């Protein structure tokens, strides 16, 4: 069972989607959730420290989710952060690109709380969280 005090950063340019993910995380018992509206905003917050998990959209202005993921994986201080991609990009090549870039998991929108919980639990299990 993962620590319910884990600090999540939800990254999406659509505020309604950020709120949906935040509320689903709260339903699952995770109340320590902050938001960022794009990859640039997210990186600034991540580099300030203290986050344990990133849930990111793919399509965003300024820096998309894939570039954010690649930047996280090449940053020594952030490289081990779990990153769950939550996106409308359902094409096989997108899923492969995310996996090759180091995504910890991938959820296609729209999704249910059960789907999110299942993906999170798989990541927690794999990382021993």
From Swiss-Prot:
Mg(2+) binds at residues 12-13, 57, 59. GO terms for biological process: phosphorelay signal transduction system. One of its GO terms (cellular component) is cytoplasm. The modification N6-acetyllysine is found at residues 92, 109. Residues 7-124 form the Response regulatory domain. Binds 1 Mg(2+) ion per subunit. Phosphorylated by CheA or acetylated by acetyl-CoA synthetase, depending on which acetate metabolism pathway is available. GO terms for molecular function: metal ion binding. Keywords: Acetylation, Cytoplasm, Magnesium, Metal-binding, Phosphoprotein, Two-component regulatory system. Its cofactor is Mg(2+). InterPro entries: CheY-like_superfamily (IPR011006), Sig_transdc_resp-reg_receiver (IPR001789), ST_Response_Regulator (IPR052048). NCBIfam families: PRK10610.1 (NF007901). This is Chemotaxis protein CheY. It comes from Yersinia pestis. The gene is cheY.
């Amino acid at each position: 069972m993962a620590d319910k005090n884990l600090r999540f950063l939800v990254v999406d340019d659509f505020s309604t989607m950020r709120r949906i993910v935040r509320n689903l995380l709260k339903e699952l018992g995770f109340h320590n959730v902050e938001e960022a509206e794009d990859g640039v905003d997210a990186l600034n917050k991540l580099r300030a420290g203290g986050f344990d998990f990133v849930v990111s959209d793919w399509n965003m202005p300024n820096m998309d989710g894939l570039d954010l993921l690649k930047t996280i994986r090449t940053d020594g201080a952030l490289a081990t952060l779990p990153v769950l991609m939550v996106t409308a990009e359902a094409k096989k090549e997108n899923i492969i690109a995310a996996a090759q870039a180091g995504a910890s998991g991938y959820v296609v929108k729209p999704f249910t709380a059960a789907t999110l919980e299942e993906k999170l639990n798989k990541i927690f299990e794999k990382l021993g969280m």
